[in-house]
Amino acid sequence: MKFGQRRKDVKAYLKRNKNDAADAEAICEAVRRPTMRFVQIKSAEQQGQLMQHRTRDVLIRQRTQIINALRAHLAELGIVAAQGDAGVSELRAIVADDRDERLPIDARASVIVLAAQLEALQTLIGSIEKRIKMQHRSNEASQRVETIPGIGVLGASAITATAADPTVFRSGRDFAAWIGLVPRQDSTGGKQKLGPISKQGDRYLRRILVVGAIAVLRRARENPGKYPWLTQLLARRPFKVVAVALANKMARTAWALMAHGGIYRAPELAEAA
């Protein structure tokens, strides 16, 4: 298993000007420190799996840009549709209808290009998601992580590809801290001071976990009796704070399933067993 060092950790040992010799000296000095932390180097297979997620993320951002441009151009002509997929489908139908006289010839020629690009992006996103699902079905650890509420196929696939060897973390707390789902510390003089979450880690994983936690919280609001812990937290803490707390718990649970095996069991089922 190969490990590397973070540039940020080596920087503290660099003396004055930066050059190859000074860099090598700093690396040699840093690697001998007993408290130095190392980064596990991802395999080519892991990198390929994560490229699927990154590419999908880029295409989704491009799709959002195209939709916003299409809505803005048509709104200039007084054509407005509802939010969501239904509204986008309505706008695409208007663009495709040659008999609709609300669109001038030049305007139609422009928005047809946007509509065609939007359709192409939808096809590409679908093909990538299909491949991610195939990888997920062939990965036993990913299927176990998916059993956690709020972590779907995308989340499980991304977590297991990013942290293929969970034993590099001492505990689920370390894993959650590595993702950046713990408070940032600014403590001194024996006085503990905690701030917002550190956000030091994989932004993609953190976003997937928080979005999944928000989905679970919405279900908890609709069915409070099924989620007593979340209901109590929501009664005394802001919604987004609870979402991050739940995302932290989801990350720790995912680490436990990857490190020790098994599938997720709801607290009441675990107590009954």
Predicted regions and their residues:
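A detector of single, family-specific signature residues
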Residues: 1-273
